[in-house]
A protein has these predicted regions:
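Glycoside hydrolase catalytic-domain context in secreted enzymes
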Residues: 1-430, 451-806
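Short beta-strand elements
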Residues: 430-449
């Protein structure tokens, strides 16, 4: 196929064999189902209640039985042919002769939920109906086994238990509507059960001797109500499993799949136990990251007294079988520590196990978390009695800490003198210290850098003993420039966009005498092509372009007279997002949190590859995924799009996704760079974070992805970082991303940012989406506020990215 033919030729050209479409294909849907099963986490299984024995009769309780949430809202939503809920999944198992389902109860929920849908409700944002005693008693006469399903939904643009801040910020528009609806349904906040759900659970517990709970959620929720409850024997964290999530859940409940997922977050006893909760809603205009590097398990495993406030530790997950493991070797060579671990299936069922390596650095002058994830491996399916040796490697320099205040060596990654312990286990809590210690004889600088993106107004941060240290304060003085535009005017489309000139564009004879395909064919260099472009041509490249075909998030490029295609972009993290009006059904993949919970890089790469095939088949060139922000707080409404509280797990999962996507010569757009951990007032909220926490926690996953997977594009975030919009932050986008990490791709804004276009270009943000402001760039250029070289550099990066795409 000719270069960029899909950008010019709008009818879909199938990628499958014999002219078949791969979009929403049986093969892709089967992969989605399999991935969902791999990431679901068995939290509890007393008396081996699961898997359900063949022939067992079951009664399905809770609206979540039919009100299935495949994924979150916003960019993570996907248009699909169908969504399989748990009732439908269990009916398939009934047809296979494995269980029998009490239909009357399920039909009761089905009728109620359909009425709520007809009144405008969306999955997960419905009210739990009252459970009639008569129906409860009929169900008990039918069976002694109950399955309760609890579901939750959240989405882009609003946070969980969203509150009006103390500083006068007023919720408006979608934020206000979603927050008010959530408050109406979830009177205790959606972290906890509603009063109606509590009443239903209590009835079921008192009536049935065998109770199983399924959690169809996208993030952290309350676990107290089942953690130590003897009346509830089994709990499956089923997450939001995509379009086949209900069937994937049934696969596990009935024993067709042995659960092997592990938590990618720490589940505390109470919402208030997370250090981020106290100030999450303190202000709509800023968030102080005072817990610093002590996020998730780094907090709970380190801070005195915090460990006892954990219900389920990071990395935890049960299986239907048992495993033993032992370290068979540990050594260091050429700066890399290698640990060999033999895993044996000692149970009666085939299954998989995940071995996790943590390191513990000496406290020294900087202070460190007690344990930090350094490597992990998942076994293949092990039959009873079968064993496998896993090789886990960690570079010594990975254990270094960043010194932002000069306690050892300012603005440097440092290995402080002392013993570095290595722990091996199947979760952070049970990881045991092995008989190997790496010793650093003297303080060693592993990488000397310079201060970048440091805070101005963060007053204090947490230390390893739970106390706080004061931080130096600075004043930020913005560089002189054009008077800033009204923020909400910036959100309007720019009128100066350029339409595509026809679909049979490969045969178009342009009037410039050159064609961009000459660069792709090696007939001329990109620099030679750039020399032909005028300054106006370059400025026109710096903004998003109109949609073509089924795209709905705009394009990039589009200089028809030079043969530069208008390459389309599309959401999102859970699959190719095409508006329903286009009539294209795609595959809805499991949410990002579930994918991270597989702890399986190879599987995630397969999902990325399959998703990219659908993107490519529908003439899209850039897929706006993966989303890699840290789960700082359970209250962030967009956590379902993100992988983990841990940057290493998030980075390795994200890198696998990018490798899979870009194997199809489709550009992945890794987002949201960076510290985008709150949706309320997301375009104007300042993330105040120390440089150490920024580098070790909130940038580290992006660094891993950039260095291991080489993404074509990075998307800067809406929020400010230490007083400067991320899209205008030169220290972040040029100093760290490009100069330190070696990123050679394109940086795009998120859609309709509040940043000034010319300031974004100067910072290294190459293109403003969904549309640019060429008149502002021209005005800034004429007043000497931006140079032609800066404009041409961003234009060149855009063209270079297009050259990488089929």
């Amino acid at each position: 196929m000719a270069k960029w033919q899909r950008s010019f030729f709008q009818p879909v050209l199938p990628l499958g064999e014999d002219g078949r479409r791969v979009t929403g294909s049986k093969e892709h849907i089967a992969l989605s189902r399999m991935a969902a099963g791999e990431g679901m986490v068995l939290l509890k299984n007393e008396k081996n209640t699961l898997p359900i024995r063949k022939g067992t009769k079951v009664a399905l309780f809770g609206k979540g039985t039919v009100d299935y949430v495949k994924g979150g809202g916003g960019s993570g939503d996907v248009t699909v042919e169908y969504i399989r809920n748990l009732y439908e999944g269990m009916k398939i198992k009934e047809d296979e002769g494995k269980v029998e389902v009490f239909d009357k109860l399920a039909k009761y929920y089905e009728e109620d939920i359909q009425k709520q849908y007809a009144d405008g409700a969306v999955p997960g944002m419905t009210v739990e109906p009252e459970l009639p005693d008569e129906l409860l008693n009929e169900a008990r006469e039918y069976t002694d086994t109950a399955i309760i399903t609890i579901c939750r939904f959240s989405g882009e643009g609003w946070d969980r238990k969203c509150e009006a801040a103390q500083d006068g910020y007023v919720l408006d528009g979608e934020e206000k509507r979603n927050s008010e609806l959530s408050a109406k349904i979830f009177e205790n906040g959606d972290f906890c059960l509603t009063n109606a759900e509590n009443a239903m659970v209590e009835k079921v517990k008192k009536t049935f001797p065998h109770v199983i709970v399924v959690m169809n959620v996208g993030g952290i929720v309350d676990t107290k109500w089942f953690r130590d409850c003897d009346e509830i024997q089994s709990v499956l964290m089923a997450w939001q499993g995509g379009m086949e999530g209900g069937l994937a859940t049934a696969d596990i409940l009935c024993g067709d799949v042995n659960p092997s997922g592990k938590l990618s977050d720490t589940y505390a006893k109470n919402l208030e136990d997370y250090p981020s909760t106290a100030n999450f809603h303190e202000s709509a205009f800023y968030v102080d990251y005072t817990e610093d590097i002590y996020v998730g398990y780094r907090y709970f495993e380190t801070i005195p007294g915090a460990a006892e406030r954990v219900n389920y530790p990071f990395g935890f997950g049960l299986s239907y079988t048992d495993f033993d493991w032992k370290v068979t070797g540990a050594s260091e060579e050429n700066g890399v520590i290698t640990v060999l671990t033999e895993v044996t299936n000692t149970g009666k069922t085939a299954g998989k196990e995940v071995i996790q390596l943590y390191y513990g650095a000496p406290q020294g002058k900087l202070g460190k978390p007690a344990k930090v994830l350094g490597a992990f491996k998942k076994t293949s399916i092990l039959q009873p009695g079968e064993r496998q040796i896993l090789t886990l490697k960690i570079p010594v320099n990975q254990m270094a800490s960043y010194d932002d205040l000069g306690k050892v060596c300012k603005s440097a990654y440092v290995l402080e003198a002392g013993e570095y312990a290595i722990y091996i286990g199947t979760n952070v809590r049970d990881a045991a210290k092995i008989d190997f210690t790496y010793v650093v004889k003297e303080d060693t600088v592993t990488e000397q850098l310079s201060r970048k993106a440091a805070p101005y107004h963060l007053q204090k941060r947490m230390l390893a003993d739970g106390s706080y240290e004061e931080l130096p304060q600075r004043e930020y003085v913005e560089e002189e420039g054009l008077p800033r535009q009204d923020k909400y005017a910036i959100g309007l489309p720019c009128p100066d966009t350029r339409g595509q000139k026809g679909i049979d564009f490969l045969d178009f004879l342009d009037s410039k005498g050159v064609h961009f395909s000459d660069v792709a064919d090696g007939k001329m260099t990109l620099d030679e092509f750039m020399d032909i472009l005028t300054l106006d041509d370059c400025i026109n490249l710096l903004g998003g372009q109109p949609n073509t075909g089924c795209a709905n998030t705009f394009g990039m490029g589009n200089l028809p007279e030079y043969g530069v295609p208008n390459v389309m972009t599309a959401d999102g993290p859970a699959g190719l997002r095409i508006l329903p009006k286009c009539g294209v059904n795609t595959t809805a993949w499991p949410c990002a949190t579930l994918l991270a919970s597989t702890w399986d890089e190879e599987l995630v790469e397969k999902v990325g590859k399959a998703g990219a095939e659908e993107v490519k088949e529908n003439n899209i060139s850039i897929w706006l995924t993966p989303a890699c922000n840290i789960h700082r707080s359970p209250l962030c409404g967009r956590n379902f799009e993100y992988y983990s509280e841990d940057p290493y797990l998030a980075g390795k999962t994200g890198a696998a996704m990018v490798r899979g996507i870009q194997s199809q010569h489709i550009g992945a757009s890794v987002k949201h760079f960076a510290a985008n951990n709150k949706e309320t007032n997301r375009k104007d909220s300042d993330s105040r974070v120390s440089e150490r926490a920024l580098r070790e926690i909130y940038l580290k996953q992006f660094e891993i992805i950039v260095k291991e997977a080489h993404p074509y594009t990075i998307m800067s975030s809406y929020n400010l970082i230490n007083g400067i919009h991320a899209s205008e932050n030169k220290e972040l986008l040029t100093g760290i991303l490009r100069d330190e990490w070696g990123f050679d791709g394109l940086v795009t804004t998120d859609w309709w940012t509040f940043g000034e276009h010319y300031r974004e270009t100067k910072a290294g943000n190459d293109i403003k989406m969904a549309a640019g402001y060429p008149e502002r760039i021209k005005e800034a250029y004429e007043k000497g506020l931006i140079t032609e070289a800066e404009i041409r550099l961003s234009a060149r990066r855009i063209l270079n990215m297009i050259l990488k795409i089929d």
